[in-house]
Amino acid sequence: MTNETTTPSEEYITGSEVLLRGLLQEGVECVFGYPGGNVLYIYDAMVHQPDFKHILTRHEQGAIHAADGYARSTGKVGVCIATSGPGATNLVTGIATAYMDSVPLVIITGNVSTNVMGTDAFQEADIISITMPITKHSYMVRDVHDLPRIIHEAFYIANTGRKGPVLIDIPKDVTNQRMAYRPADTVRLRGYHGAPEPNPAEMDALLQAIAEARKPVIIAGGGVVYANSSQELIKFVHTTRIPVATTLLGLGGFPSDDEMWLGMLGHHGVYAANMAVQNADLIISIGSRFDDRVTMKLDGFAPLAKRIAHIDIDPAEIGKNVKTDLACIGDIKNVLAYANTKAQAAQTGTWLEQLQEYKVQHPLRYTDSDTVIKPQYVLEMISETTQGEAIITTDVGQHQMWTAQFYRFKHPRSLITSGGLGTMGFGFPAAIGAKVGNPDRLVVSINGDGGMQMCAQEMAICAIHQIPVKIVVLNNQVLGMVKQQQELMYERRYSQIDLSGSPDFVKLAEAYGIKGLRATNKDEASKVWLEALQTTGPVLVEFVIPTNENVYPMVLAGTPLDQMILGYDE
């Protein structure tokens, strides 16, 4: 270790103390984690840092999903800590979830000491190599003197350009090395570029295409939300009079009560949104990556479009899935701000009338019941009682799609869901992180009975810390989305979908110290939900729903967007 002298403005401290001070310097409000042998110096240093808030989850995957929910709902960088070996590998699914959805995280993992690296030491795992395809960048810290710079760089990389997870792997001996601490305050990264400034020529070409179009449509994706550009999009839409369809992650990026909103498009998109894309002469994708759940059959996507324009912060997305005629690279907020200085109304009067007919002819609908609880009814009820103002997290499955369809999102960062990876077990821990980051907002976690059993242990956190998340479990005693696909695409050959052996969720909640409620018929549904809203602490509400209820509309794999199964007489 280097011999150093300290100046009056410096302190001689350990790598663990350097880490905690660096996190505080970056404005970190809370860290989610789980201790183990190779991070014990870090956890020991926390004892002497009363300002450092740490929440002990019950599984490392719960920690990273909570950090993810915190990041998505606040726009800040989420942070989690785990030990080496199984602690680090338990984070892999959460890292991939964040990477697919461009979520800024800094993940701190311990590792074995440098003198035994490569010897298959106890709890040794090469987490850098394991996670290389699913991180924006990774660091192995071999010298404590590099740690202040690495922490500062990690936060900068995670939260600039196309955002994403950055991993810092710290061997145990490095966490106990000492150095004269000086906080890093500059970033020098050769070859790394954040977001380029908008190119006026690119934007002018897009505005000219808008002037020539008669049936334009905007596809607004998660990039609109992550760029904090909702207001710029609203202004652009109201000026140009171009209708908007949103992706799953784009929900809330444009208000659902705006007359120019068509709804969600894609695999379970609404009729008007899907038909708008299939009949448009100009597609303008803003912060959407044209993934397969949006385009469906690729060679049948937007067949009448004369031009496809793509606005994105990441040049690698341009032309990756869909041939792009016009590209605008840059931070979406800045791109739209520039566009708004020159935008004019498009000639969309007749087009908007046609789209309104689509909305009237084929609105979202379902067959309600006077007795059983339909899941769509539950989501409508939650939407109405919260007036679209809550932060909603979902797990993955049918309930995720019902939420996307029937909850009316008015604001960005109000829907927290795993889009690209489709991670079961994500929704409830993400709700904990969202509530920690937004203590004054109502947070509702929508789960299926399958996904809830992948993360139920995190109810302990809600009870201990009194984190008042409203936990909703839609219990149909089956893996519903798998069942629906087996019904429609595998000739009803149902295989390994029965969840009838699940626990009593109310008793499970009570065992963790959380209030539990259940509704088994429609008369009980609104009563228990209102009771849940009036409960000051965390509460779980189980709604027993039919096993055979499916999500519609649905576009089958290998078919174009306009070939929807509507689920009712067409």
Report residues per predicted region.
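Phosphate/pyrophosphate-binding active-site segments
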Residues: 2-10, 145, 305, 309-398, ...
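N-terminal alpha/beta PP-like core and its mobile active-site loop of ThDP/TPP-dependent enzymes
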Residues: 2-344, 381, 385-388, 461, ...
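Active-site diphosphate/adenylate-binding microenvironment
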Residues: 16-20, 24, 28-29, 42-46, ...
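Glycine-rich phosphate/pyrophosphate-binding beta-alpha loops
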Residues: 36-39, 85, 102, 292, ...
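Thiamine diphosphate
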Residues: 108, 117, 122-123, 318-321, ...
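Glycine- and charged-residue-rich phosphate/anionic-cofactor binding loop of Rossmann-like
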Residues: 139-142, 369, 517
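Generic enzyme active-site microenvironment
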Residues: 167, 310, 393, 446-447
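Active-site-proximal structural scaffolding
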Residues: 237, 277, 375, 455, ...
